[in-house]
Amino acid sequence: MLDIKLIRKAPEECETRLRKKDPLISLQPILDLDKEIRHLKTETEALQSQRKLLSNQIHKAKAQGEDVSSMMDNVERISQDLAKLEPLLEQKESTLQDMLVRLPNYPDEDVPVCPDKTGNQVIKQVGALPTFSFTPKHHVELNQKLQILDFKLPAKTSGSGWPAYKNQGVCLEWALLTYLLNKQREHGFQLWLPPLLVKHEILFGSGQIPKFDGQYYRVEDGEQSLYLIPTAEVVLNGFHSQEIFSEKDLPIYYAAFTPCFRREAGAAGAHERGLVRVHQFHKVEMFAFTTPDQADQAYEKMLAVVEDILTELQLPYRLSLLSTGDMSFTASKTIDAEVWLPGQQSYYEVSSISQCTDFQSRRSETRYKDNRGKMHFVHTLNGSGLATPRLFVAILENNQQEDGSVIIPEVLRPYLENQEVLLP
């Protein structure tokens, strides 16, 4: 959420920055409503002050046996006026709050301005693309011999976009996840296995709703609704909502393994069949709480973790700085790590590392007290470390052999009893 004080102070600058993400944004309705609210507040507070003063005068006059009927009439009139003004003020403040929470975060100055992903800038490319003496297969075709995934049986129980791992596929998936968690621990992240269901206000705090309400799976639980998390970012951010850190305790680095659930996956085309876009998947998520001065270092740390993993897995990858039109609602800056998938003949995102400044912490009311005792909102950062479906696909497609077997990356073999090859 954005700071209304900054919008008041520099409305044109704020609007210019926001329009880099959404050219249709206008701050004038917010400014007009804010001005009206401040006028109503002044009027309301003046009446409340008058009523309090009169009440004190009535109390003293009664003690002296004086007639207070005129003052009582004035108190009644003021109370009637307040009975109209106070609900109106509350309603307008609620409307302003709703308008503010629908504004995206400001993009950083170095973020390329473009309405869509065509403006993304490749800032680094690592590893040569694999060459094959045969026509490489898509992972769905490889699976016909390997039998490590099943798409038909889960479709009977859950619909399309809900694949199942089986046989050696289960072992490879868990080897990958164990390896990822070990890498997070090596880099100093605290590990978590958090809840998969969260309250409405926790989704709000991370910036997922109200703008994207309806895109998440909801579970009715008596009087309240709970939501299946789209990413562990939601719950990790929510762990410290309405809390105050001491500056000396920052930065804090968390990493969590969870299944993730997303409704929009069904929009995939035929070229994205299989594991490329699904409703449920496994992901290790990194999250950090920092001071503003620590945020850049935390960003570099997360990026280093991702590059370390992709390098050890020996997968060709690139880093892309996302344009304003391809960034998330909450991010001020995002770099995507993308691996090469021969079956798609394209790079696909396996990690997004985002700085969110104080955008989420204002919604979650997560602050810290500096060494002088002054309160500030923390900065938050998040990044996939990593999501496994496309990583799984990348391992299969980049390491496939002509006979349909797949060479297992060396760093995963200790988790697979030193198995070197997936055999059909």
Swiss-Prot record:
L-serine binds at residues 231-233, 285, 384. ATP binds at residues 262-264, 278, 349-352. One of its GO terms (cellular component) is cytoplasm. It is an enzyme of class 6 (ligase). GO terms for biological process: selenocysteine biosynthetic process; seryl-tRNA aminoacylation. InterPro entries: aa-tRNA-synt_IIb, aa-tRNA-synth_II, aa-tRNA-synth_II/BPL/LPL, Ser-tRNA-ligase_type_1, Ser-tRNA-synth_1_N, SerRS_1_N_sf, SerRS_core, tRNA-bd_arm. Pathway: Aminoacyl-tRNA biosynthesis; selenocysteinyl-tRNA(Sec) biosynthesis; L-seryl-tRNA(Sec) from L-serine and tRNA(Sec): step 1/1. It is found in: Cytoplasm. Its EC number is 6.1.1.11. The keyword Phosphoprotein does not apply. Homodimer. The tRNA molecule binds across the dimer. PANTHER family: SERINE--TRNA LIGASE, SERYL-TRNA SYNTHETASE. Belongs to the class-II aminoacyl-tRNA synthetase family. Type-1 seryl-tRNA synthetase subfamily. This is Serine--tRNA ligase. It comes from Chlamydia abortus (strain DSM 27085 / S26/3). The gene is serS.
